[in-house]
UniProtKB/Swiss-Prot annotation:
One of its GO terms (cellular component) is endoplasmic reticulum membrane. The keyword Protease does not apply. Its EC number is 2.4.1.17. This is UDP-glucuronosyltransferase 2A2. Its main location: endoplasmic reticulum. Residues 1-15, 522-536 are cytoplasmic. UDP-glucuronosyltransferase (UGT) that catalyzes phase II biotransformation reactions in which lipophilic substrates are conjugated with glucuronic acid to increase the metabolite's water solubility, thereby facilitating excretion into either the urine or bile. Essential for the elimination and detoxification of drugs, xenobiotics and endogenous compounds. Catalyzes the glucuronidation of endogenous estrogen hormone estradiol. Contributes to bile acid (BA) detoxification by catalyzing the glucuronidation of BA substrates, which are natural detergents for dietary lipids absorption. The lineage of its organism: Eukaryota, Metazoa, Chordata, Craniata, Vertebrata.
Amino acid sequence: MVSIRDFTMPKKFVQMLVFNLTLTEVVLSGNVLIWPTDGSHWLNIKIILEELIQRNHNVTVLASSATLFINSNPDSPVNFEVIPVSYKKSNIDSLIEHMIMLWIDHRPTPLTIWAFYKELGKLLDTFFQINIQLCDGVLKNPKLMARLQKGGFDVLVADPVTICGDLVALKLGIPFMYTLRFSPASTVERHCGKIPAPVSYVPAALSELTDQMTFGERIKNTISYSLQDYIFQSYWGEWNSYYSKILGRPTTLCETMGKAEIWLIRTYWDFEFPRPYLPNFEFVGGLHCKPAKPLPKEMEEFIQSSGKNGVVVFSLGSMVKNLTEEKANLIASALAQIPQKVLWRYKGKKPATLGNNTQLFDWIPQNDLLGHPKTKAFITHGGTNGIYEAIYHGVPMVGVPMFADQPDNIAHMKAKGAAVEVNLNTMTSVDLLSALRTVINEPSYKENAMRLSRIHHDQPVKPLDRAVFWIEFVMRHKGAKHLRVAAHDLTWFQYHSLDVIGFLLVCVTTAIFLVIQCCLFSCQKFGKIGKKKKRE
């Protein structure tokens, strides 16, 4: 016979287990504040915050009243704090358009570099004025700051392209961390994050170089680092004053950025060249990539009609609205000559030379198309998001880079044998056709793309899980100071051991001087003795 006590013990055990699980859930649930950057950057951080919500965290996004992609939805589980600003969406659109056209018309070369940076300086000044409004909209808004103080946030995750997230975190007294793709020549990562970057084999971001450099390329690399350092130091001047004013003490933007607990870098070793890095730098490239989903019926039927030839996916990203009529006709003419069907994301006027094998779409499910077994190639502008989707699914690329990191991204893919590049400004229909035939017909491009895909998938932890882990880690431990290198506490001459080198040089010089003096003294002494003996 079974006693009542035998049932009571398991019941108490179950109650205790449920209580512990509930307590654990409460402990692990945190409050995360997001300081994003608009555009394609938002697409990455949006994936992170969606995963945080899935893990029972509360997420609040600070967004301006004039954004392109960051739209608050009443039904969304995300909380949005809208920052009032005087500029409009049209101002942001205009700034991005000017940036794209500057890069297309004056892509940095030895002949155009000064004209390029002169115009870039004007755009940076405009961006500074917009960014300052965003900062003031939070830091000089007592009501908003009071609400944020009451929010009980555990961590702030910021995209440093939009400056001030770190400043907001310091004013709230909470740890902060960054999520970023890069800064030109890794200037921010080197000077503020203290990551090592030997110029002999670490190519400067935007230099379009690889880790295998000739003597001439190493000269170019050294100049690239120095030039970007100069530009950033000039740009940081105004921010240094602003940061000092807000914090009420002398400081710099870079010193403040150096307080970041973790840097989530949106690349990985399938893309990057081997280089040294620090324990608080985590590579999470491709965190937005997912297995392909079924396509809309009409799109699937169009793809299936391609037969064994397959399809080509063509997209120049979300930032490029359309091309000139001449350029669109040139591209359409090349696409019409390949046996594959083409899905082209394009919003401009229908090209007169458009072939029967090509369909235009205002929007395409890019990730799902790249994951389709009939996809043979991807024509891309070289944005990091698109490149990682191609890596994830093992699709070779034809790069048509236009601005920012795109030329550098395509240079990485070319070096790894997974892409061919064509120049948007100078390409002909024959150039594009030749590039397409190369990546489709030469097996090495598909093989290299699949090799990168295998590397990407063969990770102990998925990129998204790794990113979220480190956010939760900072919340659990109130920071990650144990991963912060002592380089942050050194002056520039201590960091480069110039004081030690100087001391040793003085010691060696003194020793050499004393040896010489001893030799001279000995020579004089023995010389006098010799002369005295001769006289005797």
